[in-house]
């Protein structure tokens, strides 16, 4: 990819935007910076990092009118905005940091494992990275999981990696055309980000872009959208909780199997919940696709401790177990968390719903939830979508109130589950802050 005689505008000045500016400047590209809102102190801060950098703010169209050839977008900005659509129609190119990394790894020959899905992608990315490291590979873990990919590349000073393990969101895949992963997965598709996409099919089509190239596809046989992503002539590894597949769960014995071969008992997997069995199957399939030995992978799975805020037991009081799934920010994630827990539940739901339909939670909660506690700006919408179910629903002004009321109703053996199915920004700084408040409320009981 050449940028000779090209002017590039980087839009969005968070971590990803800054990493793109640094990469492009290092490669001698003429680059400027844009953000819809720029405070003087932020300009001063970034200006210290990049001498002479030109800043634009206000309307994006006005910035683009300054002769830019390429728009490098941070993932939080949709390329479907009218100003960006007009820029493309006039011959402008739009790309993101994953497209820039793709050019690097394609030229250098690094292996890439790429992971997306509505739910579980951070857990699978962390597990795959952990397994690769444990098996001795020089491994880079980056992307939506936290470290921008170009920041990770800069830290390595251009050194080739044995494997890149990338968590990719639909936002990052929108303008990624050249990535050709050695192995890739779409773990599942459920309603999320429907405030950005036309419908669920539109969202699924964006996820499907991860399968460009001729690498191994790892697909969920239990998900109709994922089944439809199978490409002709490609090697595919299927995983399933419902059917005999390449990787599957034998429910009678509680063992994961590969074909007819025993792999590991679910009781030996340190991660809570049945949905994590699918995460393990996907991770092992991805790692085998880059040549790692199965026996070593299964031994290392047993020592992986998982991630905070993802179906994580935080404590127990008088026999009532409290589980933090604050990262459950959409309906699919919450449904999976509920399905993976066997004891009676009191579930705390609510926050910013992102345009989701909450009716799929009706079946998930039926027969398992003894009570539902609603918080946040979209509590009323959730109540409407669950109306008519045989559920005891209680509106709460705060998360602390929800914890107190749930505990007051619970008995020994019950679970109080925070799995909101919503984003957190109406009441909290983020899902981690929401988790902190939940843990604090538990400790205060």
From Swiss-Prot:
Q: In which pathway does it act?
A: Cell wall biogenesis; peptidoglycan biosynthesis
* Family matches, as Pfam families: Mur_ligase_C, Mur_ligase_M, MurD-like_N
Q: Quote the EC number.
A: 6.3.2.9
The protein's UniProt keywords, in alphabetical order, are: ATP-binding, Cell cycle, Cell division, Cell shape, Cell wall biogenesis/degradation, Cytoplasm, Ligase, Nucleotide-binding, Peptidoglycan synthesis
Q: Where in the cell is it found?
A: Cytoplasm
Q: Which GO terms describe its molecular function?
A: ATP binding; UDP-N-acetylmuramoylalanine-D-glutamate ligase activity
Question: In its UniProt record, which GO terms are filed under biological process?
Answer: cell division; cell wall organization; peptidoglycan biosynthetic process; regulation of cell shape
Q: Which GO terms describe its cellular component?
A: cytoplasm
Major location (coarse): cytoplasm
The residues listed in the UniProt record as binding ATP, with positions renumbered to this chain, are: 117-123
* InterPro entries per record: Mur-like_cat_sf, Mur_ligase_C, Mur_ligase_C_dom_sf, Mur_ligase_cen, MurD
- Catalytically driven reaction(s): UDP-N-acetyl-alpha-D-muramoyl-L-alanine + D-glutamate + ATP = UDP-N-acetyl-alpha-D-muramoyl-L-alanyl-D-glutamate + ADP + phosphate + H(+)
Function as written in the Swiss-Prot or TrEMBL entry = Cell wall formation. Catalyzes the addition of glutamate to the nucleotide precursor UDP-N-acetylmuramoyl-L-alanine (UMA).
Q: Which family does it belong to?
A: Belongs to the MurCDEF family.
Q: What is this protein called?
A: UDP-N-acetylmuramoylalanine--D-glutamate ligase
- The source organism is Neisseria meningitidis serogroup C (strain 053442)
Native organism taxonomy? Bacteria, Pseudomonadati, Pseudomonadota, Betaproteobacteria, Neisseriales
Gene, per the UniProt record: murD
């Amino acid at each position: 990819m050449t940028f000779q005689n090209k002017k590039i505008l980087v839009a969005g000045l968070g971590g990803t935007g800054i990493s793109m500016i640094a990469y492009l400047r290092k490669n001698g590209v003429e680059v400027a910076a844009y953000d819809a809102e720029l405070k003087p102190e932020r300009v001063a801060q970034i200006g210290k990092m990049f001498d002479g950098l030109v800043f634009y703010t206000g309307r994006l169209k006005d910035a683009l009118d300054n002769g830019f050839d390429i728009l490098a977008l941070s993932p939080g900005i949709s390329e479907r905005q009218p100003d960006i659509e007009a820029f493309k129609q006039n011959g402008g190119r739009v790309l993101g940091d994953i497209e820039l990394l793709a050019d690097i790894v394609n030229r250098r020959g690094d292996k890439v494992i790429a992971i997306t899905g509505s739910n579980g992608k951070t857990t699978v990315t962390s597990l795959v990275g952990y397994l690769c490291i444990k098996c001795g590979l020089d491994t880079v873990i980056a992307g939506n999981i936290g470290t921008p990919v170009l920041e990770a590349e800069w830290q390595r000073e251009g050194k080739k990696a044995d494997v890149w393990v990338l968590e990719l969101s639909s936002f990052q895949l929108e303008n990624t055309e050249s990535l050709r992963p050695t192995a890739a997965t779409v773990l599942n598709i459920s309603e999320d980000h429907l405030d950005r996409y036309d419908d669920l099919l539109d969202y699924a089509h964006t996820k499907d872009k991860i399968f460009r190239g001729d690498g191994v596809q790892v697909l969920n046989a239990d998900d109709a959208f994922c089944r439809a992503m199978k490409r002709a002539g490609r090697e595919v590894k299927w995983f399933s909780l419902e059917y005999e597949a390449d990787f599957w769960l034998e429910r009678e014995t509680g063992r994961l199997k590969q074909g007819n071969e025993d792999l590991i008992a679910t009781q030996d997997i340190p991660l809570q919940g049945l949905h994590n069995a699918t995460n393990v199957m996907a991770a092992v399939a991805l790692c085998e696709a880059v040549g790692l030995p199965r026996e070593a992978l299964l031994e290392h799975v047993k020592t992986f401790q998982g991630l905070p805020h993802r179906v994580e037991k935080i404590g127990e009081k008088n026999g009532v177990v409290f589980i933090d799934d604050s990262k459950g920010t959409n309906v699919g994630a919450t449904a999976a968390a509920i399905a993976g827990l066997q004891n009676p539940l009191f579930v705390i739901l609510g926050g910013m719903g992102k345009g989701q339909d909450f009716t799929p939670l009706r079946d998930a909660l039926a027969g398992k939830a003894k009570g539902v506690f609603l918080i946040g700006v979209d509590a009323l919408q959730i109540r409407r979508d669950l109306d008519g179910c045989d559920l005891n629903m209680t509106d709460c002004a705060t998360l602390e109130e929800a914890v107190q009321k749930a505990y007051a109703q619970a008995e020994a053996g019950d679970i109080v589950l925070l799995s909101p199915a919503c984003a957190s920004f109406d009441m909290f700084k983020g899902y981690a802050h929401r988790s902190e408040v939940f843990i604090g409320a538990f400790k205060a009981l």
